[in-house]
């Protein structure tokens, strides 16, 4: 799993397009990005699965997320986050 400093450094290259970022250390989710249009991007890590989950939610409707993507390769994680940003701001 990415440690917090590395996580923040790698995320610094992502344009969150006005989203409000919150980072946590040693917790799930690792990061949330809130948007004024009601979208939320949640990035979490499940250790027992060795998998990151990037979930896009609209209007706090966790029962029916807009998209959830499972990622096991850290190098792919940030491209999935970028796709989630585009989905959140484009809708």
Regions found by a protein language model. Give the residues of each.
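Residue-identity detector for glutamine
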Residues: 10, 27, 47, 72-75
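Negatively charged, low-complexity tracts enriched in Asp/Glu with abundant Ser/Thr
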Residues: 1-38, 63-65
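Ampiphathic alpha-helical segments that act as solvent-exposed interaction surfaces
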Residues: 64-91
